[in-house]
């Protein structure tokens, strides 16, 4: 069954939203991250997603203390991402009580290290974030979306799915933080070619209709801005996906 996965992006402990990953286009929300996550959990969310934007910019400033507090205080699964560049960071996050760690650019830039991490921590602990841009084909972006790689999305998926990959988080960058609706076509395509991979859709969720369109295609739909802005609630999202 498709789950709604509420998401928070944090800079220095503050809840923020960026548009298309741009730190200059930042909106700060006056929410306490722990209270917000507890609210989402109480509403019925089974998984939560956290992006450490401080750590993404500077790994030496990763918000470990806050992440550990959040992981310990919520009883549902917490998944964390944000520019994770090393095996040590993955281990440290899992030691904090995080259920899954999201790794991105590393999958493209250092496949050897990425495979080592998959092998060492297991496919249930790792989510590959593949941020895509449509050129002539879907290609994977790296470096916090600032550049397109020469790697085609389907080729990357083919490579890793043969090496035991189970979970991906796929974002259509053109949609992220825009609330323009999700790219259903992209997720359908992945689901048809790689039926055994659990897809988390992210970017552009603007209405319950988007959730409805992804039902049965994705294992999870990450929702940030739409929940923070009160477009719909976690309860409404769960009901929509259950029907």
Curated annotation (Swiss-Prot):
What is the first-listed, main subcellular location in coarse terms? cytoplasm
* Any matching Pfam family: His_biosynth
The main enzyme category here is isomerase
Keywords, A to Z, come to:
Amino-acid biosynthesis, Cytoplasm, Histidine biosynthesis, Isomerase
Report the EC number(s), separated by commas if there are several: 5.3.1.16
- Residue ranges annotated as transmembrane are none
**Biological process GO annotation list?**
L-histidine biosynthetic process; L-tryptophan biosynthetic process
Q: Which residues form the active site?
A: 9, 131
Gene Ontology cellular component terms for the protein in this record:
cytoplasm
Q: From the UniProt record, give the pathway where this protein acts.
A: Amino-acid biosynthesis; L-histidine biosynthesis; L-histidine from 5-phospho-alpha-D-ribose 1-diphosphate: step 4/9
> Its Gene Ontology molecular function terms?
1-(5-phosphoribosyl)-5-[(5-phosphoribosylamino)methylideneamino]imidazole-4-carboxamide isomerase activity
Localisation per UniProt entry = Cytoplasm
Recorded catalytic activity of this chain's protein: 1-(5-phospho-beta-D-ribosyl)-5-[(5-phospho-beta-D-ribosylamino)methylideneamino]imidazole-4-carboxamide = 5-[(5-phospho-1-deoxy-D-ribulos-1-ylimino)methylamino]-1-(5-phospho-beta-D-ribosyl)imidazole-4-carboxamide
Protein family (similarity comment): Belongs to the HisA/HisF family.
This protein is called: 1-(5-phosphoribosyl)-5-[(5-phosphoribosylamino)methylideneamino] imidazole-4-carboxamide isomerase
Tell me which species this is from.
Campylobacter jejuni subsp. jejuni serotype O:2 (strain ATCC 700819 / NCTC 11168)
């Amino acid at each position: 069954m498709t789950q709604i996965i509420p998401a928070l992006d944090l800079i220095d402990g503050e809840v923020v939203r960026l548009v298309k990953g741009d730190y200059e286009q930042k909106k700060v929300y006056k929410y306490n991250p722990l209270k917000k996550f507890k609210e989402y959990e109480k509403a019925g969310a089974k998984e939560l997603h956290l992006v450490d934007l401080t750590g993404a910019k500077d790994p030496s400033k990763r918000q470990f203390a806050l992440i550990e507090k959040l992981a310990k205080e919520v009883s549902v699964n917490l998944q964390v991402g944000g520019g994770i560049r090393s095996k040590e960071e993955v281990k440290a996050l899992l030691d904090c009580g995080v259920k899954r760690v999201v790794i991105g650019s590393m999958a493209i830039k250092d496949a050897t290290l990425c495979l080592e991490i998959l092998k060492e921590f297991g496919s249930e602990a790792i989510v590959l974030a593949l941020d895509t841009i449509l050129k002539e084909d879907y290609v994977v972006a790296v470096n916090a979306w600032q550049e397109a790689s020469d790697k085609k999305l389907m080729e990357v998926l083919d490579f890793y799915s043969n090496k035991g990959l189970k979970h991906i988080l796929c974002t259509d960058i053109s949609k992220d933080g825009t609330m323009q609706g999700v790219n259903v076509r992209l997720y359908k395509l992945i689901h048809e070619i790689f039926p055994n991979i659990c897809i988390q859709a992210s970017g552009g969720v603007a209405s319950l209709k988007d959730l409805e369109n992804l039902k049965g295609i994705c294992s999870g739909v990450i929702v940030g801005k739409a929940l923070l802005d009160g477009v719909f609630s976690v309860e409404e999202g769960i009901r929509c996906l259950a029907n």
